């Protein structure tokens, strides 16, 4: 009897110690703002597991089954502001094998945990200055967060043709062209060798420029970078984007990724790479369309 009473008492104590938070699903595990509004932090972990099965079919029966289970993504994301809501930050860490693989002599043969480490300063009006490691203003499919995909992954085409992340600075601005017509301008100068590089700049720099046109105004909840139309846009919304990227004296096979191109004498081979994107995002009443070139 004593054991039953003790267990019941501990259970009641545990229940009474729980606190009810006003945070809802999708808004982060922790969402904290300092009492004096000097800083804020939101912590939002997420993961994606995947199972794949395949069989050979010879016309009569299925055979040779193969199965694969993986943790496709495992992320820890922190964001908020410091000192002022105009000075924001974002830190995102990757923990899955696909996130951290790619160690080489240029990142001291260490796991590549850091996906994003960037500060974003709204220094005047519609102007923002970004500094650190984050996604470049490239094709819309790549810039859409993996948490906001409609299918389980991005397209196979995107996996080969994108400019991903890099270390550098970005200047961003938006201009009202009349009525609800909005234009956004994004410019970037970065190191050109991808994320988590620690051993200096082996090649030249990478330059990126992107223009986005929203003739019918902004999307609900930044829906132009969210593949599904979960907000069900009542009026048609369209974004047209154009990106130009130039990686001068690139020393990796794909500029930001791939093997470093080593000559037989141990020196690095350098080549100029140019990438051009044109893309569109359209949404209306639950229907969404995304196209890229």
Please annotate each region the language model reported:
Residues 16-24, 183-189, 263-265:
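Short, charged, low-hydrophobicity "junction" segments
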Residues 17-43, 58, 218-237, 250-253:
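Outer-membrane beta-barrel biogenesis signature
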Residues 22, 118, 279:
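Short, surface-exposed charged micro-motifs
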Residues 25, 111-112, 273:
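Short solvent-exposed loop/turn micro-motifs enriched in small/polar/acidic residues
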Residues 29-55, 61-195, 200-217, 236-239, ...:
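Outer membrane beta-barrel
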Residues 56-58, 261-262:
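Short Pro/Gly-enriched beta-strand edge/turn motifs at strand-loop
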Residues 202, 212-216, 220-293:
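Detector for outer-membrane/organellar transmembrane beta-barrel domains
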């Amino acid at each position: 009897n004593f054991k039953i009473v003790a267990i019941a008492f501990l259970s009641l104590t545990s229940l009474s110690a729980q606190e009810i938070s006003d945070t809802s699903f999708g808004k982060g595990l922790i969402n904290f703002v300092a009492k004096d509004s000097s800083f804020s932090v939101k912590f939002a972990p997420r993961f994606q597991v995947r199972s794949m099965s395949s069989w050979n079919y010879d016309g009569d029966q299925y055979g040779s089954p193969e199965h694969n289970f993986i943790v496709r993504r495992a992320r820890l994301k922190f964001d908020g502001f410091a000192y002022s809501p105009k000075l924001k930050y974002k830190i995102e860490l990757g923990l899955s094998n696909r996130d951290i693989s790619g160690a080489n002599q240029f990142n001291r043969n260490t796991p590549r945990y850091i996906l994003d480490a960037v500060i974003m300063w709204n220094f005047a009006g519609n102007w923002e200055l970004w500094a650190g490691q984050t996604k470049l203003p490239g094709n819309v499919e790549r810039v859409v967060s993996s948490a906001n995909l409609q299918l389980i992954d991005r397209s196979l085409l995107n996996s080969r043709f994108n400019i991903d992340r890099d270390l550098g600075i970005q200047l961003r601005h938006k201009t009202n062209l009349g009525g609800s017509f909005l234009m956004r301008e994004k410019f970037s100068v970065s190191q050109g060798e991808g994320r988590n590089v620690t051993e200096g700049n082996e090649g030249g720099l990478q330059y990126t420029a992107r223009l986005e046109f929203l003739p019918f105004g902004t999307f609900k909840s930044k829906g132009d970078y969210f593949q599904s139309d979960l907000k069900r846009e009542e009026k048609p919304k369209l974004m047209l984007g154009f990106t130009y990227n130039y990686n001068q004296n690139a020393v990796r096979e794909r500029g930001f990724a791939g093997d470093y191109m080593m000559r037989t004498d141990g020196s690095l081979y350098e080549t100029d790479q140019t990438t051009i994107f044109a893309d569109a995002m359209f949404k209306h009443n639950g229907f969404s369309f995304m196209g890229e070139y």
